[in-house]
């Protein structure tokens, strides 16, 4: 058995309604496979629009092996000169806040997001220009301002910063679960299931789960994260790059408040490709390197942090946050990014299966965009809207040339 989701595709000559009448099985408008942030929001959005939706997940929404798992994710507007993702972040933040307010779950924390850069601050300047064009609120900091506002950070080569006060942190695992729960309230039928890999081209009429259930639908969306390349090896095996990413939490000294909000926001050091979050819910200072780790199999990779990365992260924390130089590591996680060659999302139709769609390639920055991905995909599925070329399968190469950060 390969991958978390394995789906057997069946191509037949009869139409959906004829099959349903003959077999008595229910036919959905859309079946979504994968209940991570892309799949959950897609199912929710389609159901809100009146579609009959099945949502299939082998483990649980936001499970520990998923790219959408874990406790926290950043939602930020800054993307250098890339206006597309800045505007998608804006739209998604509005929808996250509206949704979480409606379901009365405080799973967005407005910590603010602080970007910092040294001598090479061209990307920071490009971010400022884009935020201005998009009407995003931000505050610029020079070196003196950063030193005064954040004395707990050893700035060293850092010269400039920008602060996004409206941005912050989503409590990821719980947020995905909340979206799925509300989707079910809206009529989505949830299945915990596996199946076999696709075998036939053409129009897919139904998938067969490992429990023997046939799920018939007019269209199928595969939002399976790091498993997309295993489910569709011929098409995506060389174009989806699951990478090992190690995350660390450092304990905060007793009575210390400088490392929790509002004393410390969510933060990113541009040249170092390091990001982190303040002490949230007593978990400690979160830190991770944003460089892509080694390529891994999401089913078999070790979930234990390496001695080499542990040493590197300890050294970095001691340098940037001297007060935490002797702080204990209180928690670790090994997850994965699900990268495309450029870092752009993959939202496109299967080249040989006319009613099968891919939704993936989150590339380490996708979680925040769940609502916007769902809106875009619904427009493709239901209205045939003009596609964004950057999301096409055609643009996904077999070697990594990252351009989106």
Segments the model singles out, each with a brief description of its role:
Residues 47-68:
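Glycine-rich FAD pyrophosphate-binding loop
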């Amino acid at each position: 058995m390969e991958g978390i989701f394995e789906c057997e595709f069946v191509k037949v000559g009869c139409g959906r309604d004829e099959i349903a009448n003959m077999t008595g099985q229910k036919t959905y408008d859309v079946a979504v496979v994968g209940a991570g942030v892309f799949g959950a929001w897609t199912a929710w959005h389609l159901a809100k629009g009146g579609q009959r939706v099945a949502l299939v997940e082998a483990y649980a929404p936001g499970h520990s092996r998923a790219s959408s798992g874990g406790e926290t994710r950043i939602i930020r507007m800054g993307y250098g000169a890339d206006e597309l993702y800045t505007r998608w972040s804006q739209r998604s933040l509005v929808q996250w806040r509206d949704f979480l307010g409606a379901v009365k779950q405080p799973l967005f924390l407005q910590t603010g997001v602080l970007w910092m850069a040294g001598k090479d601050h061209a990307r920071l300047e490009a971010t400022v220009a884009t935020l201005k064009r998009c009407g995003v609120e931000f505050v610029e900091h020079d070196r003196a301002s950063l030193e005064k506002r954040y004395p707990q950070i050893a700035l060293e080569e850092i010269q400039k910063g920008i602060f996004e006060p409206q941005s912050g942190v989503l409590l990821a695992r719980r947020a995905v679960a909340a979206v799925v729960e509300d989707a079910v309230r809206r009529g989505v039928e949830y299945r915990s299931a596996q199946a076999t890999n696709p075998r036939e081209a053409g129009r897919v009429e139904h998938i067969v789960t490992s429990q023997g259930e046939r799920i018939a639908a007019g269209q199928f969306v595969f939002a399976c994260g790091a498993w997309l390349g295993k489910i569709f090896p011929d098409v995506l095996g060389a174009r989806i790059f699951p990478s090992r990413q190690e995350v660390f939490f450092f304990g905060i000294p007793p009575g210390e408040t400088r490392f929790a909000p509002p004393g410390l926001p969510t933060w990113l050091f541009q040249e170092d490709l390091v990001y982190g979050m303040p002490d949230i819910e007593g978990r400690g200072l979160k830190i991770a390197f944003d460089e892509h780790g080694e390529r891994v199999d999401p089913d078999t990779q070790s979930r234990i942090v390496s001695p080499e990365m542990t040493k590197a992260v300890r050294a970095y924390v001691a340098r940037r946050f001297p007060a935490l130089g002797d702080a204990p590591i209180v928690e670790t996680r090994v997850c994965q990014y699900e990268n495309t060659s450029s870092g752009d999302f993959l939202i496109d139709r299967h080249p040989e299966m006319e009613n099968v769609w891919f939704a993936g390639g989150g590339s380490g920055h996708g979680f925040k965009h769940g609502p916007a991905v769902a809106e875009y995909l619904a427009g493709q599925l239901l209205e045939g809207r003009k596609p964004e070329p950057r999301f096409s399968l055609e643009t996904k190469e077999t070697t990594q040339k990252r351009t989106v950060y």
